[in-house]
Regions:
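N-terminal small-domain helix-loop-helix segment of the aminotransferase-like
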Residues: 1-50, 57, 237-240, 303, ...
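PLP-dependent aminotransferase-like
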Residues: 60-121, 142
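A short helix->loop->beta-strand "cap" motif at the edges of active sites that frequently abuts
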Residues: 67, 88, 146-150, 177-178
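Helix C-cap/helix->beta junction micro-motif
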Residues: 86, 146-147, 266, 300, ...
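Active-site phosphate-binding strand-loop segment of PLP-dependent enzymes
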Residues: 97-168
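PLP-dependent enzyme catalytic core of the Aspartate aminotransferase-like
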Residues: 109-110, 286, 295-304, 310-344
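Conserved core segment of the aminotransferase class I/II
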Residues: 179-253, 340
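Conserved glycine-rich beta-strand-loop-beta hairpin in the small C-terminal domain of fold type I
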Residues: 235, 251-260, 270-283, 314
């Protein structure tokens, strides 16, 4: 597919700003949601320049300075920065691992306070690769509604499952008892971070949803940050999303299998992952995570992230990108495992 051709639409030379985004772009996103089983009307969608901006808009909508949001642990470290820029505090709820990952709903309930304005879920989570299950989604909606908190559902990696699972919630978009904002974007869904287009879809009780949309429209109108060319290109790009996703999905799955095969029978354990672009390797705590990262970089020529970047509760975990070219990933994985064997 020629992405540049889609960006060359002459209509992009006309500037006709719409705070929520051009209707054809929003209609293309509704079709993308429909593929995941959700019927989302175009007037439920608001475009942003990135999912980070979508978070920023949501925090402006939901929070006053000093309010709190709940985020998963372990997860992506950007939440602290996004919240801090809005003078919002971050508390965490744990994801537990017992062979598979799951939300500790009881601890989430304990973490909710009168100043909690939103609960963030990432499905699949980065870096654990765990999807929110339908049973967890129902519990989350009930808890959020009881505490008058919104749900921010980050679904940027939803198109990259590693296996099928009928218990999985394909999206948290549903008009349940809690205001819900579902986030996505071209950066992950089409592997095009340079195009800077993301979105949020609003669900929940009608009154709360309509008030949220009106207020978000004011926020978006204040910035008008989404470029016209990418909005014109979005329908053509999203129509070919499956073609863009397929090679990424194949590479990620293949690299994960290579890593599992390399680690088999060694002191290194590959944790279960259901989706996303990362793998987690549990290694012996004979070194600190920083020491593991440095020795692998300096002596083996392999780059990995330490688990504490993602707020793992204990050592020693290493996070690997599964996006590396296979001819680079396979020897890199072998060098990691060999280093672990020599250090155990």
């Amino acid at each position: 597919m020629n992405v540049l051709a889609a960006l060359a639409d002459p209509g992009a030379l006309a500037y006709e700003p719409d705070p929520v985004g051009r209707l054809p772009a929003r209609e293309a996103i509704t079709a993308d949601f429909r593929r995941r089983g959700a019927d989302v009307a175009p007037d439920r969608i608001l475009l942003t320049a990135s999912t980070s901006e979508a978070y920023a808009f949501a925090l402006k909508l939901l929070c006053d300075p000093g309010d709190t949001i709940l985020v998963p642990r372990p997860s992506y470290p950007l939440f602290e920065y996004l919240a801090g820029l809005e003078s919002v505090s971050v508390q965490s709820y744990p994801l537990r691992y017992d062979g598979t990952w799951h939300i500790d709903v009881a601890e989430m309930a304990e973490a909710l306070t009168e100043r909690t304005r939103a609960v963030v879920v990432v499905s699949p989570n980065n870096p654990t690769g765990s999807f929110v299950k339908m049973e967890e989604a129902e519990a989350l909606r009930s808890l959020a509604a009881r505490h008058e908190a919104a749900i921010l559902s980050d679904e940027v990696f939803a198109d990259f499952p590693l296996r099928d699972d009928p218990a999985r919630a394909p999206t948290l978009f549903a008009d349940g008892p809690a205001l819900t904002l579902c986030l996505g974007g071209l950066s992950k869904s089409c592997g095009l971070p340079q195009l800077k287009l993301a979105w949020m879809a609003l669900a929940g009780p009608a009154a709360a949803r309509e008030e949220a949309r009106a207020r978000l429209e004011v926020v978006a109108d204040t910035y008008l940050s989404v470029s016209t060319p990418v909005q014109h290109a979005a329908p053509a790009i999203l129509a070919r999303a499956a073609e863009l996703q397929a090679p990424i999905r194949e590479r990620v799955r293949s690299n994960l299998e290579v890593l599992r095969a390399a680690a088999a029978g060694s002191p290194a354990t590959v944790l279960d992952a259901e989706g996303g672009w990362s793998a987690i390797l549990h290694v012996p705590a004979t070194r600190s995570e920083d020491e593991w990262v440095l020795v692998l970089a300096e002596q083996d020529g392999v780059l990995v992230h330490p688990g504490y970047f993602f707020d793992f509760p204990r050592e020693a975990y290493l996070v690997l990108s599964l996006l590396s070219p296979p001819d680079e990933f396979a020897p890199g994985a072998a060098r990691i495992v060999e280093r672990v064997k020599r250090s155990a």
